[in-house]
């Protein structure tokens, strides 16, 4: 999830991670009596970090697996820091070579595969993990993030030819210099690569574990992180418990400009982490059920969804009843974008003929973002026209969309390009058959409201709507196969740089993160040029051109960036929502004496 400007390389190299490891593995600090109860809004898809893409599965992976890098818990804006690495990487050759030194004495969680013997983490584990992204059998949605490693293209091509990826083959771009040192060489300059290795997806796995559970690696996560998966009822409940092999981390961070940091430091300074012994995650797809569970003290933290914001947060502050009960609010702006795309490879709506582009743009022109924020978001969002959100390097607050709400213009476009209305008032294809737009959404009450809003929008321009209902994991599966025509989707920053958002439209990422399966050679050439550039006015200019090309071709309609309102029960100590980190429970505590 993140980004790095060239002038900051030296300072990053000098940075030290505030969560320093203890000199020897301590007695487990986590207290089994400290149980954190949280919820996921949609179902997880699994826990093989190379294979998952969604926010919820990645949250669990972040608690179980350890990437080489991470982020400082308190620093804002997000600040890169070592995790399994001893220090920041040594970067050379114009950011084409990265060398990581791995901490000694890190061990994987117990598993029968290890035959009761301690299994230490080594540089070879990270080399193996990186190779897994390029194995065609894994179909990793994050393959492109590791696509720049020198020599892996050839290994992948041979795997496609033979049907088997050769993990033992020497690769120029992945050199294990010694047991604890990994050198990565890239084909091109990449100032963001250290941020890529902070992704939860890049957490180290043990080869013997993957091979032992090859039939279902999503169900058998074994990592070196602070937690282990001890129970999983798919789409229902996930239970994590503290990893007894975890080395322990000492809580120490410098305060940011946030006034609340002083209180957090007073409560947490010097504690051995993690403190929480058990994390129970319930899948609660309906907003009302989650809200009631929090009110009944069945949840310790609630990501308050839009439906109940007017009740819980009058004037964006907790209501009097919640305040009396000691409930507090953590409110931030998410580094995310929310948008509706149209699949440009669809046989009916796809392609780049002028009439198809006009049709897609007309559909987007019919949709009123202001109404969407008022009705669906209940005011808990900011209208956003640019695909790089506030707080992320490359955001352009001055950008104005060429597909604003304008149903009059939409109707003129449709009339001009021959999408005429029949006697029933609905439009037809130029060949006379009914024109029906297909849209996918989940069965949740919020999505039903969104269906109605799209129905209302399309009625303005005389287009019929067919809504296909799918659970979220099935939507993702179909989307990655370029089988969905359209969906309202979200992308939250993997790392705080605009590249993480621009890669959503890169042609070769179709089948991964390019939901619209948008492929345009001119766009791809310009994007690849930006990949080798640090943050600069020139890169920002190219980003603006790239986004304009996406809008001109009727690929996507930007909607908003959300406020994230987290309600905290009084027993939650030291919590701070991070813009990039997902499993914040690694860094905060529970005080059972404060439970109601």
Predicted regions and their residues:
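N-terminal secretory signal peptides that target proteins for export/translocation
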Residues: 1-7
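Bacterial N-terminal signal peptides
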Residues: 8-23
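Sec/Tat signal peptide C-region and signal peptidase I cleavage site
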Residues: 23-29
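Cleaved targeting-peptide boundary
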Residues: 29-35
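N-terminal lobe/hinge region of extracytoplasmic solute-binding protein
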Residues: 39-93, 222
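Residue-level recognition of beta-strand termini and adjacent short loop/turns
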Residues: 92-94, 178, 234
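Non-catalytic accessory/assembly modules
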Residues: 140-163, 167-197, 201
């Amino acid at each position: 999830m993140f980004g790095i400007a060239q002038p900051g390389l030296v300072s990053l190299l000098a940075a030290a991670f505030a969560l320093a490891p203890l000199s020897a593995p301590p007695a487990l600090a986590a207290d089994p009596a400290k149980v954190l109860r949280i919820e996921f809004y949609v179902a997880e898809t699994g826990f093989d970090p190379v294979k998952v893409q969604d926010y919820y599965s990645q949250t669990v992976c972040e608690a179980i697996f350890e990437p080489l890098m991470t982020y400082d818990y308190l620093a804002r804006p997000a600040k890169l820091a070592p995790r399994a690495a001893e220090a920041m990487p040594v970067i050379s050759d114009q950011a084409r070579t990265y060398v990581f030194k791995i901490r000694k004495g890190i061990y994987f969680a117990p598993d029968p595969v290890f035959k009761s013997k301690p299994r230490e983490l080594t540089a070879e584990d990270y080399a193996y993990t990186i190779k897994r992204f390029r194995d065609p059998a894994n179909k990793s949605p994050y393959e492109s993030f590791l696509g720049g490693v020198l020599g892996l293209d050839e290994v992948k091509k041979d795997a496609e030819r033979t049907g088997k990826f050769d993990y033992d083959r020497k690769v120029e771009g992945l050199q294990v210099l010694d047991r604890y040192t990994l050198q990565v060489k890239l084909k091109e300059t990449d100032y963001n690569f250290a941020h890529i290795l902070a992704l939860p997806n890049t957490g180290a796995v043990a080869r013997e574990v993957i091979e032992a559970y090859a039939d279902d690696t999503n169900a058998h996560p074994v990592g070196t992180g602070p937690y282990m998966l001890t129970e999983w009822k798919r789409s229902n409940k996930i239970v994590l418990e503290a990893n007894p092999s975890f080395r322990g981390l000492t809580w120490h961070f410098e305060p940011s400009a946030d006034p609340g940091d002083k209180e957090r430091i007073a409560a947490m300074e010097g504690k051995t982490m993690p403190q929480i012994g058990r994390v129970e995650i319930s899948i609660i797809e309906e907003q009302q059920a989650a809200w009631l569970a929090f009110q009944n003290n069945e949840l310790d933290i609630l990501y308050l969804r839009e439906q109940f914001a007017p009740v819980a947060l009058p004037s964006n502050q907790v209501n009097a009843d919640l305040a009396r009960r000691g409930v507090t609010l953590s409110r931030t702006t998410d580094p995310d974008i929310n948008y509706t795309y149209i699949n440009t490879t669809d046989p009916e709506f796809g392609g780049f003929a002028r009439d198809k582009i006009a049709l897609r743009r007309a559909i987007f022109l019919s949709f009123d973002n202001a109404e969407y924020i008022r009705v669906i978001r209940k005011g808990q969002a900011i209208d956003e026209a640019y695909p790089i959100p506030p707080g992320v390097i490359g955001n352009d607050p001055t950008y104005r969309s060429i597909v604003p709400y304008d149903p009059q213009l939409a109707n003129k476009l449709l009339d001009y390009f021959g999408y005429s209305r029949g006697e029933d008032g609905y439009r037809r294809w130029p060949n006379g058959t009914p024109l029906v737009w297909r849209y996918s959404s989940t069965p949740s009450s919020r999505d039903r409201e969104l269906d109605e809003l799209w129905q209302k929008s399309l009625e303005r321009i005389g287009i019929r709507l067919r809504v296909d209902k799918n659970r979220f994991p099935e939507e993702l599966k179909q989307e990655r196969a370029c089988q969905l025509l359209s969906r309202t989707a979200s992308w939250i920053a993997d790392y705080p740089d605009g590249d993480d958002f621009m890669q959503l439209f890169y042609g070769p990422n179709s089948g991964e993160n390019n939901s619209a399966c948008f492929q345009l050679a001119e766009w791809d050439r310009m994007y690849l040029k930006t990949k080798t550039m640090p943050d600069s006015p020139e890169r920002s200019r190219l980003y603006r051109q790239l986004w304009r090309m996406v809008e001109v071709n009727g690929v996507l309609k930007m909607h908003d960036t959300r406020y994230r309102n987290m309600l905290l029960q009084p027993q939650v100590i030291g919590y701070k929502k991070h813009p990039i980190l997902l499993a914040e429970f690694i860094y905060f505590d529970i005080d059972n004496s404060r439970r109601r």
